[in-house]
Amino acid sequence: MQCLLRALGATPALVLAMSASAQTADKASLYPAAAAGDGATTGGYNLSRWAEDWRALCDPAKRTDPIDALKCVKLTPSGDVYVTFSGEARLRVNHTTNPNLRDSPAQRQDIVRLVGGADVHVGEHLRVYAEVAHGGISGRELGAPAATLRNDIAVQQLFVEAKGRVGAVDVGARYGRQEFVDGPNLMVSQRDNNTIRYTVNGLRAWARTETMRVDAFDLKPTQYGDLGTEDDVIDPARRFSGVTLGFVVPKGWFGGAKLYVDPFFWRRRNKVGAWGGRVGPATRYYLGTHVFGEAGRVTIDWTVNHQWGTFRDQKIDAWHLLFAQNVRLGTSAAAPRLGFHADYASGGGGYGDGKLRNAYAPFGNNIYYSYGLFLTPSNLITVAPTFSVSPTPRLRLSAAVQRAWRANVHDAVYRASGAPFAGTQNVRDARIGDVLQLQAIWTLSPRLSVTGRYEHLAAGPSLTRAGYTSSDFLAGWISFRF
């Protein structure tokens, strides 16, 4: 294992630290898994497949079909060394009218995602996870598809992890290429909407007790090519590092509520930052808090953070205020939910000489605002009532009507890539537009699901006066996971 760590580029000190931390541990993790920063696990499955725990299926008596056997393939007679195989096949069709919000022929994307992973466990304390992916795309009016949509084969993840227990503290470290989702979804996400997911390279380490945690990381993004594995490299221009804390709110404070508070301090460096047609080095710091969880029938996800630093010769002074909440209209878990989200992302200075007040998410989940990728939390104010219901245990319907404005009319409207809609910085009307969102998810089984999505973006004056127009987005996809 130490040889493998060195092959992946770990320093000798890291090798020794990870090996030492693996000497004492317990099967059960101390900190609640739902808030440990690895994403949500539902029905045994997680978007990040390494976050799944299939140890129970090492007992053949608990398997219900042949696929279950792939979750624990023993490599030693004792079963201390075993491998968990995982995979996904997703077929998807996107239809977008007026792509890029220009009056132009509709775009159709026929997309294929194939993913295969192997999680090798060496006892309770060491593991190696490897995952490869293929992205295929065809259709019409495609332009030049990004490497996250078209890629013959990519090493999507490859890391080694060691974990253990020191007294009453779980400690661990993960080194290599990995998905990172430890933070608010609108700020950090593996971006499942892509065919090839967003991954980063480097070190993440943690220490956790039953009621608090600390996670530290130093990561660089993967820069994908569109051919084979050899052109998927570590991006030399960008670096993301920081510390996130986590605290479990005592249940007695709010009548048994499951609430968590995560303060964070991050730094993002980019040698080729771009605002207002200017390119230059940028260093941005984030200091904020993420509060989330359930209190009775109410679910909340709130984030406040201040951003500062420099872009070229400009000082950065920006804010994110992100609030999502809903209430369950009944006692059962399947009862309808009614809620709203209200978000503020400051703007201004992208085309000026004063302070740069445009908020910026490191690599957030932009489909939250628009599957057409027409909006991002920079110079943006949104308010959206939301509703979801499950008329049957396997069908989930949801709807939202989102109204959007610019926070600063002297700056542009920005799309998901962070690029501006050219010319919008010269329009002095705040209204961006409205987005109607409808979605249906039919879960035939934990492994198989079918999703349909429709959106209509009704362009407002900020867009139409700069020559942009409205758009419809319609998509359907089927996903099989094992």
Name what the model sees in each region.
Residues 2-5, 14, 20-106, 123, ...:
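N-terminal periplasmic/intermembrane-space "pro-region" immediately following the signal or transit peptide
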Residues 36-54, 60-64, 277, 303, ...:
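Extracellular/periplasmic loop regions
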Residues 85-87, 130, 173-175, 205, ...:
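Membrane-embedded beta-strand positions of outer-membrane beta-barrel proteins
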Residues 87, 114-120, 157-162, 203-207, ...:
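Residues on the lipid-exposed face of transmembrane beta-strands in outer-membrane beta-barrel proteins
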Residues 88-92, 133-135, 176-180, 219-221, ...:
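Outer-membrane beta-barrel pore domains and translocons
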Residues 444-477, 481:
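Predominantly the C-terminal beta-signal and adjacent terminal strand-loop region
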